Design a protein with these regions (language model features):
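Active-site nucleophile-adjacent alpha helix/oxyanion-hole segment immediately C-terminal to the catalytic cysteine
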Residues: 1-43, 54, 58-59, 140-148
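Conserved active-site-adjacent core of cysteine acyl-enzyme catalytic domains
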Residues: 24, 34-134
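Compact, aliphatic and Gly/Pro-tolerant "microcore" segments centered on a short helix or tight beta-hairpin
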Residues: 126-148
């Protein structure tokens, strides 16, 4: 079961999604992201599809290549999904899509979202996704700078 992780920083949604999928804490995922040069100690920082894929791999997951997404119905597998693209800033919000026999649900790391599982797909406009296939069997945790 994947547990929702709430982002601790205003722009930490990608880090929170990586933490959810890997079963680690936000703090541990953020420290790794800082070590990889993806994030900084203080926001704002933004995770691109490439950065997020790297972080997912370093956390022991096997992301496949990111792709554009325009309809939730076309998603069939566990994925990190970019939603609600802002044309002015060229930014989006990362969430985790979990497929089920009933169509799936979204785990949203945004603190103001109170429900653990979102199914209000009409309020979330997908723009891209990174399918996450399966755990990497040869995974060895990356050493961190400090305590996790």
């Amino acid at each position: 079961m994947i547990r929702r992780v709430v982002q601790k920083d205003s722009t930490g949604c990608g880090i929170a999604c990586a933490a959810m999928l890997s079963g680690t804490t936000y703090r541990r995922a953020k420290l790794l992201a800082i070590d990889l040069g993806i994030a900084s100690d203080r926001p704002p920082y933004y995770t691109s599809s490439r950065d997020l894929s790297l972080l997912l791999r370093k956390l022991g997951l096997e992301p496949s290549r990111g792709r554009r997404l325009s309809r939730w119905e076309s998603l069939q597998c566990l994925s990190v999904v970019g939603i609600n693209h802002n044309d002015e800033t060229d930014t989006w919000h990362w969430v985790v899509y979990v497929p089920t026999a009933n169509g799936g649900y979204v785990l949203d790391p945004k603190k103001s979202i109170k429900s653990a599982r979102r199914v209000d797909f009409g309020r979330m406009t997908p723009c891209s996704c990174i399918p996450v296939l399966r755990p990497n069997k040869s995974f060895k945790p990356t050493p961190l700078r400090g305590p996790a």
